[in-house]
Amino acid sequence: KNNDTIWHDISPEKIVMVEHFTITSDAEAPTQCSPYEILVTGNTLTIMPDYIGYGLTRHLPHPYLNHELCATNSIDALAAGYTLFDEVASCELKEDWTTCVIGASQGGGNALAVHKFMDTNPEYAEVWKFEYSYAAAGPYNPSLTMEKYFEKGKTSYPLVYPFTLKSMMQSYPDILGKYTEEEMFSDEYLQMKDTIDYMFESKNFTTAEINEGLLKNLRITVDENLSDDEIY
C-alpha cells in the first residue's frame, strides 16, 4: 500500500528464462544491475541466470561458450527463481502457464543448449511445461564459429579468442591441458598477457573496454582491408 493505493501481484502468464549476451564485468550480471529485458517480456515471470563466474560465483572462471555447463547452470537458476517467486509472491502462475527460453549472442547459444537439455531430459520439460526457445545470432557450434572467424582472418571483437581459449582450457583440461597459451598466441599478445589476464579475471572491465585495449595494443597492421575497429 502506497499513498492509499493497494498494489496486487498479477499472475504471470508464463515463465521466460532470458539468457544474457557476452559480458566480462560482474557489474553487468543480471543480479548486479537492472536488465532492460525485464521491461520487455510482458506479464511473465522473468528469470535471468548470471552464469557461473558472475554474481555469487564471481570468484570462479566463467565457462564461456561451454554451452552444456551453462545450460545446467540455467536449469538450476530456473528452479531457484521459481522457488523465490513461490515464497514471496502473493499470486500464482496462471493455470495454463508454460516456459520458454530466449537469448541472443552468447545467450542464443545458451538458449539453444537449454532447449536441447529439455529435449534430452523429458522429465524436466514436463515439470516446466517447456514450450519453445528463441535463439538469435548465437555461436551454436563453438568450433565451427571459431573456424569461420579464422577463415575471415579479421575481427572487430578480438576478445572472443582469448576468452574462448581460456574457457576451453579450464573446461576440458584432459584435452587441452597439454597446451599452453604461450604456444597459441603471438609475441605481441604475450607481451601484454598479464594485463589481459587481469582484465578478464578481475571481472571489473566490460567487453567494450577489453576490446578497446586489444585493438589499441595489438593492432599492428593498418591497410585498406581493415576498418577502424578491426584487427587481424
Predicted features along the sequence, with ranges:
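A conserved short beta-strand
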Residues: 124-140
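Alpha/beta-hydrolase fold nucleophile elbow
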Residues: 89-106, 129-131
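Accessory cap/linker subdomain of secreted extracellular hydrolases
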Residues: 136-231
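Short beta-to-alpha linker loops that shape the active-site pocket of alpha/beta-hydrolase fold enzymes
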Residues: 22, 50-54
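Glycine-rich nucleophile elbow surrounding the catalytic serine of serine-hydrolase chemistry
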Residues: 72, 103-116
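Short, surface-exposed "cap/lid" segments of acyl-processing enzymes
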Residues: 2-42, 58
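Alpha/beta-hydrolase active-site loop
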Residues: 64-88, 115-116
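Surface-exposed acidic, glycine-flexible loop patches that form ligand/cofactor-binding
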Residues: 2-11, 36, 84-95, 122-127
